[in-house]
Amino acid sequence: KELKDSFDTNLESSFSQFLLKTFGEDKAIDIVEKYFLGNLNGDVVFWQLDRDKTIRSGKVMAYGEDGKRKQKFSWIRQKNCELKQCYFGEHLIDESDLPIAIVESEKTACIMSICNPSYIWLACGSASNLQSWKCRTIEKFDVTLFPDQNQYDNWKVIAEEHKFQISKDCEIWYEKGFIEAKDDIADYYLSH
């Protein structure tokens, strides 16, 4: 019920407004529908749904018009939700044969699904939230990790453990001055 009640069909959350301004109405609506983005008092709700479309939790975040996060996040947990977290976007895995890409932030997964639709874009939610137990659920898939700048070495350990591919793009772009320290793949795509 909370998922349906929060669904941002009118693009009212600050993040949906950013998507609208950046990519236009059709693509913004596509992202809201694809990822089941919600709206809670103007803040976006990034719902975590597993492959069975069971709600695990909802991450509530405020964004400015520039698409930058404004404050710390909070969580919504339904009475009957499964408390064990999953990847943001995990519900998309069985809807496509595309390879999987994992990034840190939910915002980046949404943006990259527009900028590079040749992957199913998932987010782990934080640099330290790419955890081995979560990776086991996707080991049989073709997976590429896209760590933020300065996280390559940390994520490489997980990539090797699970035989995932890993991109060094953010490290290269940082060395060439294309992105700032701690930026991610979406920062590069939005500025180029």
Where would I find each of the regions flagged by the language model?
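Generic intrinsically disordered, low-complexity segments enriched for polar/acidic and small residues
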Residues: 4, 12-15, 20, 32-33, ...
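Phosphate-handling DNA/RNA-contact segment within nucleic-acid enzymes
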Residues: 43-141
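TOPRIM fold recognition
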Residues: 51, 97-98, 109-192
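Compositionally biased, intrinsically disordered low-complexity regions enriched in proline and serine
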Residues: 8, 16-19, 24, 36, ...
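TOPRIM metal-binding catalytic domain and adjacent DNA-binding surface shared by DnaG-type primases
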Residues: 1-56, 92-95, 165, 192
